[in-house]
Amino acid sequence: MPKTFYLTTAIDYTNGAPHIGHAYEKILADVIARYHRLKGEEVFYLTGVDQHGQKVQQSAEKAGIAPQQFVDEITAKFIALWDKLDVRYDRWAATTDPVHKTCVQGILQRLYDEKQIYKDKQEGYYSVRQEQFLTDKERDPDGEFGPEWGQVEHRTEENYYFKLEPHKEWLLGYLRAHPDCVTPDFRQTELINADEKLSGDLCISRPKSRLSWGIELLFDSAYVTYVWFDALTNYISFVGYDPSISSFSLQPSTFQEKWPALHIIGKDILIPAHGIYWPIMLHALGFPDEQMPKFLVHGWWNISGAKMSKSLGNVIDPDSLADKYGAEALRYYLMSDIVTGKDSDFEERRLIELYNSDLANSLGNLLNRTLSMAGKYRNGQVLGPGRLNPEPGMAEGERWNLGQQLNVVSGLAVVANKEASGAGFDIHDVIGVLNHWTTQCNTLVEVAAPWKLVKDDSRASDLNAVLYCLAESLRIIAILILPALPKAAHGIFDQLNWKMEPELAGKEARFSLADAEWGKLPDGHIVGKPTPLFPRIETSPEG
């Protein structure tokens, strides 16, 4: 059976409403998942919420409600937003789910039985915000703990620890032998440097005396699981991992069909959680090297180069943006105006500019003028593919320009198809090629001047060639832009009157990368009438 392409995002902490960073990551994963489905692959996309931990418990207490009610209310906001933004996932991961709880408890019990977890006393400074003890490495040059740690207090506490150091050399060797483990590659270098400095073990418990909202340890009911150990395990708990089976090769087939995963995460949670703790946890559970996950590490959306934060009051709300401009406008901006793996500045003005220039003025205009001309000049028929009239109906230079532009446009089908076929993570590159193609199609209209060709019967073949070239370009562009703009892709197909079978309406099965080959639009195809697909976003003179 073919291997499933399994991808995950970080699960979002339910102590507050979703922000633009959450939306970017989930849309990025959604677009990557849709590209793989477009190629005919089986895809499993997992996302969800992290519902345990001290911050959740404190927020619930502040709100005067039970933790479960609090996380349920926050979770509903995330689910509603992903639905609004057309994020299509295959499984929802909530860490209060009994399936997850059972898996976490089973993993911890097994590691405890294998002496990989031990109990010890720790004394030192504790970050309430980050829910961890701090060491001198976390102090700034002045010897103080920075504001990122929030409230810091001195504590003495007994807890359970997971052994990290015995796996340090293995992880170093693995990372050096697998240079493609982390994308972009400079993040892998950072991870290796961090692993070289690794010391100490990981505290994986919290006493119930100060934190009751968590998954209880089976071997000591006075403790709950540390939120990071709990959260990381979701990547295997929701796809059928059985912690009672120590051999990976004996795991259920439903799990082995999916694993290993591609983890799509922000740069702030690669080190140490995902890049060090998680591989070591898997190694301790007996996962072989070839079954280690890969990581796509994305950057942040900033405001004027500074990180968004609640304290600065500059957090961007994706829900209100989607209401204001539409989900497709937001999806397009977030995918086109950032290089995957790097940071970018969020500007509402840029969102409007890119939508109006790339979609309303370029792609939308191309669709409108193509269908209008086909309707006006050929009663909606696309006759072709046609050829240039060999008779001297125009000046040699003019004829060469038209032929050249036709070749440019049809040739871009190969370029765009190749770009999308190999689409890994550089979504903005694919969008850039499609934008260039659309621009060249609009240039073809200006070069060919169909309104002149229709007046000369000897130029009928030229007109047919131009209209076919435009309609066929739109058909293929719709296929390739589907992952980023699913609703727009369906809209283009609808107006082209293409694949209109009722059972395909609104479904991804309507699109296939195999169909994105030049020449599949049949001679005599009847297109529909144009309706505005991308209404311009009008701004005030001051805006």
Q: How would you name each of these model-derived features?
A:
Residues 1-4, 44, 68, 120-125, ...:
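Basic, alpha-helical terminal appendages of large translation-related enzymes
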Residues 2-40, 44-47, 99-103, 147-376, ...:
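Structured secondary-structure scaffolds
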Residues 2-117:
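N-terminal Rossmann-like or analogous alpha/beta NTP/dinucleotide-binding catalytic cores
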Residues 85-94, 112-125, 137-138, 153-155, ...:
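Short secondary-structure capping/junction motifs at helix and strand boundaries
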Residues 114-168, 172:
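Cys/His-rich short segments
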Residues 254-264, 418-425, 450-453:
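Helix-loop segments that flank and shape redox-cofactor active sites
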Residues 339-350, 355, 373-431:
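Long, amphipathic alpha-helical stalk/connector segments used for oligomerization, subunit docking
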